C-alpha cells in the first residue's frame, strides 16, 4: 500500500514536470515566432494594426476631453495606415516596457515620439525618419536657472525610458556631470511637470515638442522657462519587430506618400503651427 502511494506521487510529479517543460518549450517557440516571423499576412487578414502609445504624450499621442486618442502621431498613423488599407487600434502602454510589449506581440508598432538611437536599433526595426525634435530643460522662472551650468546640485526629473534620460545616463554626459546625480524618474512627463510646479523638482529634461505644447496650454505660460541642451537632434521613427520586414517596407512607402501629398504638413500645422520638420 505504501509502495503504491509512493509510485502514485512519483507519477504525479513526473507528469507535472513534463507539463512544465512542454509549456516552457511552447512559450519559447511562441516567443521566437512572434519576434522573428513576418506577420504581414496576418495583418492584412485582420485589416488592423495595434499601435502602442503613451496616452499622456502631448502633442504626439494623447486623449482629448472625450477620451478619444488624438495627436500628431495618432493622426499620422491613421493617415499612413489608411494608405495601406489598414486601420489603427491604439493601445495605451507603459513607456518603460514598450519594446517588451512589441516583442511579445501585444502590439505591432511603437508610434509615439519614438526617437531612433543605437540602443533601440538593437531591439526594433525602425521605419524611415518622419519628424525631428530635440531635448530641452523646462524650469520655472522663480528657480533662477538661466543656463545649463545653473543646474549644478539641482533636482532634475525625466521620464523612465525616454530618449532624453538614455542620453543623460550615458557615460561622460556633460549635463549629468553638471547636475551631479541621477535624474528623478517618472512614468509620464506630466507627473514630472506637476512636481516641478509644486517645487519638488528644479527642472525637467523633456522633448521640445512636448514642452512647447504643454506650456502653451497652461494657465500661466509665462511662469515657465525653457533652456536648450547640447544633446543634438532626435529623429522619430515607427518601431516594429525585426521580423516584420514587409510591414516595415509598406510603412516606409506609405510615409513617403503622406509626405509627398502634403498630408504630414497639414497634420504638423494643426499641432505645431509649422510644416513638418
Question: What does each model-identified segment do?
Answer:
Residues 10-16, 36-113, 261:
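Extracytoplasmic small-molecule ligand-binding "clamshell" domains
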Residues 83, 91-92, 96-109, 123-125, ...:
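Short helices/loops that flank or line small-molecule/ion binding pockets
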Amino acid at each position: 500500500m505504501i509502495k503504491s502511494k509512493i509510485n502514485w506521487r512519483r507519477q504525479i510529479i513526473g507528469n507535472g514536470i513534463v507539463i512544465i517543460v512542454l509549456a516552457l518549450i511552447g512559450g519559447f517557440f511562441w516567443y521566437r515566432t512572434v519576434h522573428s516571423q513576418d506577420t504581414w499576412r496576418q495583418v492584412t487578414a485582420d485589416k488592423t494594426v495595434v499601435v502602442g502609445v503613451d496616452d499622456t504624450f502631448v502633442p504626439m499621442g494623447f486623449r482629448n476631453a472625450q477620451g478619444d486618442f488624438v495627436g500628431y502621431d495618432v493622426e499620422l498613423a491613421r493617415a499612413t495606415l489608411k494608405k495601406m488599407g489598414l486601420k489603427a487600434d491604439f493601445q495605451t502602454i507603459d513607456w518603460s516596457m514598450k519594446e517588451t510589449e512589441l516583442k511579445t506581440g501585444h502590439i505591432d508598432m511603437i508610434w509615439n515620439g519614438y526617437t531612433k538611437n543605437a540602443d533601440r536599433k538593437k531591439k526594433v526595426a525602425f521605419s524611415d525618419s518622419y519628424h525631428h525634435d530635440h531635448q530641452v530643460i523646462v524650469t520655472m522662472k522663480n528657480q533662477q536657472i538661466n543656463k545649463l551650468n545653473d543646474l549644478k546640485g539641482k533636482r532634475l526629473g525625466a521620464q523612465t525610458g525616454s530618449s532624453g534620460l538614455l542620453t543623460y545616463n550615458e557615460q561622460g554626459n556633460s549635463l549629468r556631470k553638471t547636475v551631479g546625480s541621477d535624474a528623478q524618474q517618472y512614468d509620464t512627463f506630466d507627473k514630472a511637470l506637476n512636481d516641478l510646479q509644486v517645487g519638488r523638482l528644479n527642472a525637467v529634461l523633456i522633448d521640445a515638442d512636448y514642452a512647447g505644447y504643454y506650456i502653451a496650454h497652461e494657465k500661466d505660460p509665462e511662469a515657465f522657462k525653457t533652456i536648450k541642451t547640447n544633446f543634438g537632434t532626435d529623429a522619430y521613427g515607427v518601431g516594429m519587430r525585426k521580423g516584420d520586414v514587409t510591414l516595415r517596407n509598406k510603412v516606409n512607402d506609405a510615409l513617403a506618400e503622406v509626405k509627398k501629398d502634403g498630408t504630414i504638413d497639414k497634420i504638423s500645422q494643426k499641432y505645431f503651427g509649422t510644416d513638418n520638420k
